[in-house]
A protein has these predicted regions:
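N-terminal secretory signal peptides that target proteins for export/translocation
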Residues: 1-15
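Bacterial N-terminal signal peptides
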Residues: 16-27
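Bacterial Sec-dependent signal peptides at the C-terminal "C-region" and cleavage site
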Residues: 28-36
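Flexible coil segments in periplasmic/lumen-exposed cytochrome c-class electron-transfer proteins
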Residues: 34-35, 94-168, 172
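Sequence/structural segment immediately N-terminal to covalent heme-attachment motifs in c-type
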Residues: 35-60, 73-86, 173
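Gly/Gly-Pro-rich "capping" loops immediately C-terminal to redox-active cysteine motifs
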Residues: 58-95, 100-110, 210-218
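Acidic, Gly/Ser/Thr-rich repeat motifs that build Ca2+-stabilized beta-propeller blades
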Residues: 134, 155-316, 372, 446-496, ...
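Beta-propeller domain segments
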Residues: 157-163, 231-233, 250-253, 269, ...
């Protein structure tokens, strides 16, 4: 919220924004009083830092620098405080290695920043010590956000972009916690929202009221040796019996090498309001873990055949092998970088590998012909993101081939097995989404396509039979710092050889890292904003909101 917003607090919209900002700011500045510093620092790291700097503090080579084994002198600590408070971008050298990435500012109070940096100082062989809230406050005063309050107030919600002709766009609710998935029975009365830590909330679409349904601490399995808590919970859907399914990914270092465990929880009853309740483990599988690039299960959905389809992503960026270490192991396993099919009606389902070579399937849906269309996020090597027609038994290239490239993405890219044939992505014929005068397969590198929906006959001509794809936006430094941050409309048609090709138009832009879309009610699409930033230099600490795009009433 900015001073400009303060001038309009007399009206209802302004008052609502002020209340939301106030609640967020209050939580930001008082959360540090609830737990002991060691626990709080670890949990803050898991929520805000682990995705890029990894569970072992090693970072990602060339992109996100390590926090383990670096300069933690007084000058180094001051530099770390400054980066957390105001962000950083551009080339830098850490431990003699060059990095060229982006770190957005993290919206935390002085005490919380002190706690998370104290956790870092006392982890992974770092020298130990303690950072105080006073140290943070003194360094922050010299940054472009001189107080925590000024920083929080600067992170207002972006204005809504114009709705396309024939539609309305409205804000349904502002979220108390960042959410990654939506699910519903499709009737348009309510949405269920999944946070990345596993909390589930119910959103009343008529009133915008949000209430907790069940919390991660009450149902997620905990084991000695767990790293993070959990690593990611990113998939949620209903089965045909109305049971809610939630997939969690957890790394555990009790075994050597460390493992990644996927657990799918399933609700077992309804509460007094008729909402799903009491989730319990239904399916579990483990395979060798990795400190970086554990994409694991990121989407699942019931198909037209009644089976549960589960996208289990790659455990590496490009299929590389590690010879030793706590996360040792080969590149991929037979059940990673692929699409599973499970029978939701049996108590101990077996994995059928439905399709292979899929690096990171963040979304898929079926059209009115029963064809599955899937979004796929690409590697750090700047290959285009993909849109694929998924057919049983096919291989979609990973880790041997990205997009429709004929060159290797990396010097270490493994050679494919003899005779293996790849199915290439759908070509984008423009005008948007990465098209730059010649067809591309399929979207801008690092634009991060997320969920996907197919629009049926309850949408107007020009939209009926097309797909909507939100794009989370780039996390890696690129020439275009605003690649993604939008919702695309994708129209597919067959070329002379029978292959699908796409016409892609930008429908909504800019948005605050849109991550999922969901159909609920006739002619209504719900869009989930993960946070509020509309370019990759903006903080993604503050939680986002749910928007409704609806066919306008005639």
């Amino acid at each position: 919220m900015t001073p400009r917003v303060c001038n309009v607090l007399r009206d209802a919209a302004g008052a609502r924004m002020a209340l939301g900002a106030g609640l967020f700011l209050g939580a930001l500045l008082t959360a540090e009083a609830r737990e002991d510093p060691a626990t709080r620092g670890r949990e803050l790291y898991e929520r805000n830092c682990l995705q890029c700097h990894q569970s072992n503090g090693a970072g990602v080579p060339g992109v996100f620098p390590p926090l383990a084994g670096r300069d933690w002198s007084e000058r180094g600590i001051e530099r770390a405080i400054r980066v957390v408070c105001e962000g950083a971008s551009g080339p830098m050298t850490v431990n003699g290695v060059a990095y060229d990435g982006v770190m957005p500012p993290v919206v935390l109070g002085d005490g919380a920043i002190a706690d998370v940096l104290t956790h870092v100082l006392n982890s992974w062989g770092n020298p130990g010590g303690r950072v105080s809230a006073r140290q943070v406050r003194e360094v922050r005063a010299t940054t472009k956000y001189p107080t925590a309050e000024r920083q929080a107030l600067a992170m207002e919600y972006p204005p809504l972009p114009p709705a396309p002709a024939g539609f309305t766009l409205r804000e349904v609710a502002r979220l108390p916690q960042k959410a990654v998935r939506m699910a519903s029975d499709g009737k348009g009365r309510e949405l269920f929202l999944l946070s990345e830590n596993g909390d589930v909330r119910r959103l009343d679409l008529a009133t915008g009221a949000i209430r907790p349904l069940f919390l991660a601490k009450d149902y997620l399995t905990r084991r000695e040796g767990d790293l993070g808590g959990p690593l990611f919970v990113l998939a949620m859907t209903f089965d045909r019996r109305g049971r809610l399914l939630i997939a969690a990914n957890q790394q555990n270092a009790a075994a050597k090498p460390a493992v990644n465990t996927v657990t799918i929880y399933r609700t077992t009853r309804r509460d007094a309001d008729g909402s799903p309740a009491d989730p319990r483990p239904w399916f579990e599988v483990s395979y060798p873990g990795r400190p970086a690039y554990i994409h694991a299960v990121e989407h699942m959905a019931i198909g037209p055949d009644g089976m549960l389809y589960v996208g289990n992503g790659a455990r590496t960026d490009g299929g590389f092998s590690d010879p030793e270490g706590p996360f040792a192991g080969g590149g991929e396993t037979p059940i990673t970088a692929c699409l599973w099919r499970l029978d939701p009606e049996v108590e101990k389902p077996e994995i059928e590998v439905y399709a292979q070579g899929i690096r990171n399937a963040y979304g898929f849906c079926w059209n009115d012909r029963g064809e599955m269309i899937l979004t796929e996020n690409g590697p750090d090597a700047h290959a285009p993101e993909e849109l694929n027609l998924i057919e049983r038994g096919r291989h979609y290239g990973f880790p041997y081939q990205f997009s429709d490239w004929t060159r290797k993405a990396y010097e270490r890219t493994p050679e494919p097995p003899a005779g293996l044939k790849f199915t290439t992505p759908i070509l984008n014929l423009g005008p948007d989404g990465g098209f730059n005068g010649s067809p591309v397969a399929t979207f801008d590198p690092h634009s991060c396509p997320g969920g996907i929906v197919f629009l049926g006959d309850d949408f107007p001509e020009g939209y009926r039979g097309t797909y909507l794809v939100p794009r989370f936006g780039n996390l890696i430094r690129t020439p275009d710092d605003a690649a993604g941050f939008d919702v695309l409309r994708v129209a597919l048609s067959r070329d002379a050889a029978g292959a699908y090709q796409a016409r892609v138009n930008t429908l909504l832009k800019p948005l605050g890292r849109p991550i999922d879309v969901h159909l609920a009610g006739r002619g209504r699409v719900y869009i989930l904003e993960y946070s509020r930033g509309t370019h990759n230099g903006a903080s993604y600490s503050p939680p986002g909101r749910v928007l409704e795009l609806a066919v306008a009433k005639s």
